[in-house]
UniProtKB/Swiss-Prot annotation:
InterPro entries: EF-Ts_dimer_sf, Transl_elong_EFTs/EF1B, Transl_elong_EFTs/EF1B_dimer, Transl_elong_Ts_CS, UBA-like_sf. Coiled coil: none annotated. It comes from Colwellia psychrerythraea (strain 34H / ATCC BAA-681). GO terms for cellular component: cytoplasm. Residues 79-82 are annotated as: Involved in Mg(2+) ion dislocation from EF-Tu. The gene is tsf. Associates with the EF-Tu.GDP complex and induces the exchange of GDP to GTP. It remains bound to the aminoacyl-tRNA.EF-Tu.GTP complex up to the GTP hydrolysis stage on the ribosome. SUPFAM superfamilies: Elongation factor Ts (EF-Ts), dimerisation domain (SSF54713), UBA-like (SSF46934). Pfam families: EF_TS. This is Elongation factor Ts. It is found in: Cytoplasm. CDD domains: UBA_EF-Ts.
Length: 282
């Protein structure tokens, strides 16, 4: 498989490794991006292999709530200029309101608003996409929005302020699972295999490597789970400890971030302005 400059660029952005290291890793992996990252981790070259996708596309995360139900919707556009446009935000809010009212699937939501989307694309001159919708149910819901780029909803039992703080933590720390026990077996097995190979590459015998990995795996499952993470407001305590101390529980959470995993075509500011002027004249 031919290794393109775009592939090398993506791997550099995801790992912060050097250009030649990235190119060589892609050649070795025959163009398989995830395998290249895995191999680079083993070789100690990756600096950010945990990065959750390349944040590129623009748009907004909308959160709408009613009694016992919250809807989170991601609507994308091509530039941050349009992401702040009243027409775009009006459309995004209408989509989110419809999601909350009917609890429809993403396919149903896209179909429902396709005609309006096409009209907006024609008016604004950029591609608009209704990308994701997630729902959270619970008697007590806390939400947090970081601008319009990150949206979090937490379901649980406890006082509103504490649940809000947990939502803020989720926004900042990006947990993937609720507790260490919720980390899927295949994820744990894959990470354990990588850690053992890394330890053996350091010259450790397999028996010693496996013992070393036990501690590393506990750290890994803690870092990717909400209750195992250090609480951002009291870093010496885990979220799990904070929950116990405050007598609150969390049953579920959803975190959405604009453009997660979408590759964005890069344009300089002048080109972006020219594109907007051209669209306005069309």
């Amino acid at each position: 498989m031919a290794i393109t400059a775009a592939m090398v660029k993506e791997l550099r952005e995801r790992t912060a490794a050097g250009m030649m290291d990235c190119k060589n890793a892609l050649v070795e992996a025959e163009g398989d991006m995830e395998l290249a990252i895995e191999n680079m981790r083993k070789n100690g070259q990756a600096k950010a292999a945990k990065k959750a996708g390349n944040i590129a596309a623009e748009g907004a995360i909308l959160i709408k709530t009613t009694d016992g139900l919250a809807a989170l919707v991601e609507v994308n556009c091509q530039t941050d200029f349009v992401a702040k446009d009243d027409n775009f935000l009006g459309f995004a809010n209408e989509v989110a309101d419809a999601a909350l009212a009917s609890k429809v699937t993403i396919a149903e939501l896209q179909a429902q608003f396709e005609e309006k989307r096409i009209t907006l694309v024609t008016k604004i001159g950029e591609n608009i996409n209704i990308r994701r919708v997630e729902y959270v149910e619970g008697a007590n819901l806390a939400s947090y929005s970081h601008g319009a780029t990150i949206g979090v909803v937490v379901a649980g039992e406890g006082d509103a302020e504490s649940l809000k703080h947990i939502a803020m933590h989720v926004a900042a720390s990006k947990p993937e699972f609720l507790t260490p026990d919720d980390v899927p077996a295949d994820v744990v097995a894959n990470e354990k295999r990588i850690q053992i190979e890394m330890a053996m590459n350091e010259g450790k015998p397999q028996e010693i490597a496996e013992k070393m990995v036990t501690g590393r795996m506990k750290k890994f499952t803690g870092e990717v789970s909400l209750t195992g993470q250090a609480f951002i407001m009291e870093p010496k305590k885990t979220v799990g400890v904070i929950l116990t101390e405050k007598g609150i529980t969390v049953s579920n959470f959803v975190r959405l971030e604009v453009g997660e995993g979408i590759e964005k075509k890069e344009e300089d500011f002048a080109a972006e302005v020219e594109a907007q002027i051209a669209a306005a004249k069309a």
